[in-house]
Amino acid sequence: MNAVQDAQDQLTKLIRCWEPIDSDDLSKGHTMSDPVYQLCSYMPSPKDYNKFHVNGVQMDSDDYTTILTMFANQLPGYAVLNVCLQEAFQFHKANHPSQVSLRCLCQRDGCNLPKTLTDFLDFNKGPIPAVNF
C-alpha cells in the first residue's frame, strides 16, 4: 500500500482525529477520537511551528465544499493528502495588522499527527499505519 492507495481507500469513510485530552491544558497530551469526522485539522502556531493545535473538524463550522471536492477529485495514481490554507482575519480596525494563520486539513485516519509541522508533513507522505493509536 502507498499514500495514494491509502487516501483513496479512506476517501468515503468517517475518520479518527487526534484531539487534546484537555483543551485548557495541552500538556496532558492528545488522544484519538472515535471515527466520527470527515476531516481532521492541524494548525501550527503562527509564531512557533513546533507548537500546534489538532482536532476533528465540525462540518457545520464552515463551508468545506471546496475542500471536500479537492480530496474527491482523484485521478488514477493521484490523491490529495493535505490541503493547507494560509488565512488572514481582520479582528480590529483596518489600520491594525491582520491575524494570519496556517490551517491544514486532511482526510485519513489519524492524519493530524500532534507533532511539529515538519513531522506532520513527513508522516502524511506515506500510508498511515493501521495501528491502534
UniProtKB/Swiss-Prot annotation:
Pfam families linked to this entry: DUF5354
Origin: domain of life: Eukaryota
Protein name: Uncharacterized protein C02B8.3
Organism of derivation: Caenorhabditis elegans
